[in-house]
Amino acid sequence: MSQMRCRHLLIKYSGSRNPVSRRTGGSTASVSDESAKAELQQYFDAINAEGCTEEVFAKYATKRSDCGSFKDGGDLGVFGPGDMQAAFEEGCRNTAVNSMSGIVLSDSGYHLIFRTM
């Protein structure tokens, strides 16, 4: 299980290592930890309510993710051990293929992860 592939929906907040949204170009420095988690929980609930498929997840990642991968439905491509931040990689590894994680915190912010490989 060395190679993985995931989509993600990232919400940055004031504590993110680079608090700037790649989707909007705006600062996220005024977004609190609590509001970022609460917003991500709403997306988690909406994705599950709509049917947690890769297509549904990609739609929401395109709509809201603060990562530049929003343009590709949150797709990060194939990666191996050590290619991503440890917390994110662990979140991906602990998520079954074709399913979504719970909320994962990394230095970049809060993520939902949909593992595709």
Where on the chain are the PLM-derived regions?
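Proteostasis/folding factors centered on peptidyl-prolyl cis-trans isomerases
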Residues: M1-S30, M84-M117
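Short amphipathic alpha-helical segments, especially helix-boundary/capping motifs
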Residues: S16-N18, E34-S35, S65-D66
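Short, cationic low-complexity segments
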Residues: A29-L40
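Peptidyl-prolyl cis-trans isomerase
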Residues: A38, Q42-A86
